[in-house]
Amino acid sequence: MEFADSDKLAVGENVMAIGNPLGYDDTATTGIVSALNRPVTVTDDNNNEIVTNAVQIDAAINPGNSGGPLFNAAGQVIGINSSIASTATSSDSAGSIGIGFAIPSNLVKRVADEIIKDGKVKHVALGVVIKSDTVEADGVTRGGATITKSSATGSAVVSGGPADKAGLKEGDTIVAFNGNAVNNNYSLLGYVRAAALGDKVTLTIVRDGKTMDVD
């Protein structure tokens, strides 16, 4: 199977999900890309929250679809189906309500390549403490992730870390990551998690009411 560049996905594109929902083998469902870079939070075995900026789709996926491919109209893999939003009170009664999520193919391919090569995945960190916030700059109010002091350590920026080296400081609000809007702290965490070790990125920040880019 060929992997497409998930960075080139557009809202409204046709998609097809393949999987074994509820034990029904080789089931195909269709829909469209409903949204991009949708922060989705899951909890791992150690009760740590993991945030991924997912592809949101309206194709019906249910328990048993997770791990199955999501294709575009050209038959290329654009993601791996992972989870759904649900109004159910337990996972046993959860089912599709037209809001499903897939891990973008670019992230899938990078993680798979790292596991094949090194047997593990290396994740990056900015080295900052953040909180969801709103900020005004150039007459526009927007959401973002503001760097704030940790109640545990009393520091906002890790000394010598990537953010420190880029000149970020307490009170800066990050509003974009490589040109993609950062609406809250979960959005930023998703972009950071998708980045590879050694990647160079541009952050758009608001400092003292002014917008600027830092690398």
List each language-model region with its residue ranges.
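A structural signal for short beta-strand/turn segments enriched in small hydrophobics and glycine
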Residues: 12-18, 75, 163, 171-174
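Conserved active-site neighborhood of the chymotrypsin/trypsin-like protease fold
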Residues: 1-26, 180-186, 191, 202, ...
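Interdomain regulatory linker/hinge segments that flank or connect interaction modules
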Residues: 10, 14, 82-136, 206-211
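Residues located in well-ordered beta-strands
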Residues: 28-32, 129, 146, 204, ...
